[in-house]
C-alpha cells in the first residue's frame, strides 16, 4: 500500500516545501507518500455560482481520475469529522491491514470539492472550522500522516 496526497494547486512557498520534504523523507522507510499536484482552474473575477460549480466539477474530474477503484479516499472538508491523531492513526492502520488499494487524501482548491468527490469519499476529515491556506494545510496533513505512522509503530514521536 502507498499513501497518496492529491492536491489542487502548486506549492509556492519554500518554507512549506522544505517542511513537507522533511516529513516525506522520514516516511520513506515506512509507508511511502506520493504527492500529486493538479493544476487549479482559474477563477474569473465575479464568477457566478454556476461558473464556480463548473470549475469545481472540472477539478473534481481531475481528482477522481487519480483515484483507483480499490483506493480508500479521505477528503479534507470543514464539515467533516473532527479526529484525534490517534483516530487518524487507526484509520491509516486499518487501510494498511484491510485495504485493497492505496490510501488517498485529497485537499481541494479554493472553491472546495465537487459533489462527485464527496460522494466517492470514504471519510471526510475536518481540522476544525477555521479557514487555513490550502498550502499550509498540506504541511499540517503531511505531519499528521507521519504522526499516524509513528503512533502505529509505537514511536515516542507522539506524546
Curated annotation (Swiss-Prot):
CC terms in the record's Gene Ontology section: cytoplasm
Subcellular location: Cytoplasm
Binding-site residues for S-adenosyl-L-methionine, renumbered to this chain: 75, 108, 127-132
Keywords: Cytoplasm, Methyltransferase, rRNA processing, S-adenosyl-L-methionine, Transferase
Chief localization: cytoplasm
Xref: Pfam families: SPOUT_MTase (PF02590)
HAMAP family: 23SrRNA_methyltr_H
Oligomeric and partner information: Homodimer.
Function field: Specifically methylates the pseudouridine at position 1915 (m3Psi1915) in 23S rRNA.
Name of the protein this chain belongs to: Ribosomal RNA large subunit methyltransferase H
Source organism of this protein record: Lactococcus lactis subsp. lactis (strain IL1403)
